Amino acid sequence: EIAQCLVGSEMCIRDRLGGAYFIRAYRYYMKTLQYGDVPLVLDELTEPKVDYYTTTKESIWLKMIKDLEFAAQHVPEANKVKGGQVTKAACKHLLAKYYLLEGRFDDAIRITTEIINGGVHKLCTERFGSNKSAADKDVIWDMFRIENKSLPENTEGLLLTIDRYGMEGNTSGTQVMYNALPYYGLTGVIKTPNGANGMSDAAKNEIGIVEKYGRGISRIRPTWYAQKGVWTIDHVEDFSDYRHRTDNENWMTMEMLVYNNPALKKSGNEWYGKHLQLYSDQGTILCKDTIRCWYGWPNYKTWYPDPDRVQPKGGPGDFYIFRLAETYLLRAEAYVWKGEWQKAAEDINTIRKRANAQYMYSAADVEKQKIGAVLDERARELYYEEPRKVELTRIAIIYARTGIPCYNGKTYTLDRLTEDNFWYDRVVEISDFYNKGVQTPYGNYFTCSPFHIFWPIPSYAINANSGGIINQNKGYPGTEKNIPPLVYEGD
C-alpha cells in the first residue's frame, strides 16, 4: 500500500506505515503474552528462513511501543477511514496496554483519556440501528447486531473486523454459536424428569430451538463465575443488568429452553414443551454432562445469523476488536495500579450505568478488591471479546515487575514467574475445574500449573529451525537446549 501512495505524499506513507506498525504490534502483543520470548521479525520475508533466534519479550515490547507512538501520531481517526482499517484510537488503545506492561501508568491514563475525550468516540447509550424500535430490547442488544456494529451512529467501536456474507475472502463464518453454546442436543444427555430423551438440535423441529439460538458443541465453556458469580453482588443476582437480562433473552439459561424432542410428542410424554429442569423433584440430576451440556450464555453476543446452514453455527458478521468500553476499563486499571480508587470506581461505574447495573462501586470497594474489580467488570462487559488469557498474563507480569501487593495478600517476582504468578492463582481461584478433582465423562482431569502462564513453543517450529535456536518455555520438554535469548537494542 505504501508503494501505491503518490510520490512525495509523506502523509500517506506515514498513515500506511503506522497501520502496518499497529498490525505487527498487535500480533506481538498476543504472541508474547501467549508464548513469552519469541523470535522478532522486523523485515519482510521473501524466501524461507530457518535461522531464527528467540528475543526477549521485554525488548520486543519497547520496540512495539516506539512503533505505536509513531502510529498514534499519523494514523487517521475512525471517521476518516473505511470500516476495518486501523484507526488512531485503536493505536492509542493498544499503546495503553503496552504502557501498562511497562509500568507507565500515567502514560496509560494520558493516552486512554485522549481517546475518551477526543470527540470521535463515545459510549453508545441510546437505542439505534435495525432493532431500535423493538420495545423489549435495549442498547446492549443493538450494539451487537451484526448490521449495527459498523454504522456511523455506533461511535463505540475503535477497530472491527469486517466479515459480510458474500464478501471476497469470506469462508465459513464466525461459528460463534457452535463454539460457545452448550451441547444441548447431544443425544441422551438431557433427560426429562420421567427419564425420556428430552432435547433435539435437529432442524425443522416443531419447537425450533436450533433455528432460534443456534447449534453449539461447547468448545468454550464458562465457569460458574462467568455465569453467576460475577453477576451476584451482596448475594443478589442482577438480572436488570442488560448484559445479564433474561426477560428479553439477552442472557439465556438452560431453564429457559423447553423439551423439544419430537419423540416426546409422538409418545404423548407430558414433558414435551415444558421448561428444562436440572433436577427431578426427587433430587436426581437430569443431565449426564453438565460440563458441556448445561450452562448459561450471552445470547445478545453469540447470535450470528447463518443463512447457509439449517442448523445455524454462526455466520459471517463484523466483530469488535477494540471498543471504547474497554478503554474506560484500561484507564480504571491504571488508576488501580496507582491507588487512585475513586477515579477507578468512576470509570468502572460509567460502564455499569450504561448497562443498567444496580450496584455501583465505591472507592472502598475498589480499594478492597483492587485489580479484581476491574477483572470482574471486564468479564461482564467483554465476554467473548477480550482474549482473557492474554490479559490475565499481562496483569500477572505487571504484578511481577512492580511488586505491587495483590488483593490475595501475595506479591510476585519476575525471577519466579513460571513458578508463582497471578495468572495461575486467579485461574485456580475462579475456575470450577482446575486442580479441584473435576473429571470429564471420559475420565480426564482438569489440571493446571504455574508454568502454563506461557504456552509451549510448538516442536515443529523448533525442529524446522535448523540454522538457529528457538527456546522452549520452562516446564515443557526441550528446555535443556535453550540459550540466552537475544535482546533487541533498537534500529
Regions found by a protein language model. Give the residues of each.
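Single conserved hydrophobic/aromatic residue that forms the stacking wall/gate
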Residues: E1-G8, I13
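C-terminal substrate/ligand-recognition segments
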Residues: R215-R352
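Long, intrinsically disordered, low-complexity segments
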Residues: K63, L101, K132-A203, N299, ...
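An aromatic- and glycine-enriched ligand-binding surface/loop that stacks and positions planar moieties
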Residues: Y99-W271
